[in-house]
Curated annotation (Swiss-Prot):
The complex is composed of one ATP-binding protein (YusV), two transmembrane proteins (FeuB and FeuC) and a solute-binding protein (FeuA). It is a lipid-anchor. It holds the Pfam family Peripla_BP_2. One of its GO terms (cellular component) is plasma membrane. Residues 1-19 form the signal peptide. The keyword Cytoplasm applies. Induction: Repressed by fur. Induced by Btr in iron-limited conditions. This is Iron-uptake system-binding protein. Belongs to the bacterial solute-binding protein 8 family.
Amino acid sequence: MKKISLTLLILLLALTAAACGSKNESTASKASGTASEKKKIEYLDKTYEVTVPTDKIAITGSVESMEDAKLLDVHPQGAISFSGKFPDMFKDITDKAEPTGEKMEPNIEKILEMKPDVILASTKFPEKTLQKISTAGTTIPVSHISSNWKENMMLLAQLTGKEKKAKKIIADYEQDLKEIKTKINDKAKDSKALVIRIRQGNIYIYPEQVYFNSTLYGDLGLKAPNEVKAAKAQELSSLEKLSEMNPDHIFVQFSDDENADKPDALKDLEKNPIWKSLKAVKEDHVYVNSVDPLAQGGTAWSKVRFLKAAAEKLTQN
């Protein structure tokens, strides 16, 4: 009788454990969403076979993908470090990440150790670098061109199962753009606005569809200065050229990391008599770091933030 009771007790405990295991498995399944499987993904006319959805993503070189991850709340397995650390801008998504190297200096050995399902690299990398990175796993070179911002975000959304969220972000941006564009046209339609970036103590301007210009001129429709229209890439400018353009509004982007050798470059600029003579300066229409200075300008995150800043700054008296 005792043997039967003991057997029943063991059986009961086994069934309870199985039930708990099943429940935990079910909970884990719900938390992870759809079961991962190999799928073919189309991105900029190329096909990649990847495991989706996945959070085993290593980002190297593509700050654009880091910004998309921030907007979609994706926490990658590996992320780009800046001067050996993750900057505050990305602290909310790098809590589980290991560094994959600096922006243009990928650590291939470290990425290999991670064994990621997919590596998001950058089209800025030379072909030889991309070949080396691809030895660590399936590698997708993510475009650094502003006009591909939607495709870039949808790529990460497909990899992580967040397509619905990405589509809503795009739809919300386009709706906000319509409303803000109307307000700006009423207030600043004929105003001249310029975005400059200070790097290594020098002043740079960008082509009409590059950096934040893609939003300022491309989306909002403000007229680009001739110097911006003529620029073919990041272009060194000067105070004398700024004086010739004499914009009504100036957006200044200044990062300490990019001016480590000349930390007082912005202060020195602001003291310069030519700078002080500019219309935008006289009218207090100079906006320093209205968006985080590490932002790439042509991503969904950058566009959403810059649109908000432009709406505020360009419609003020």
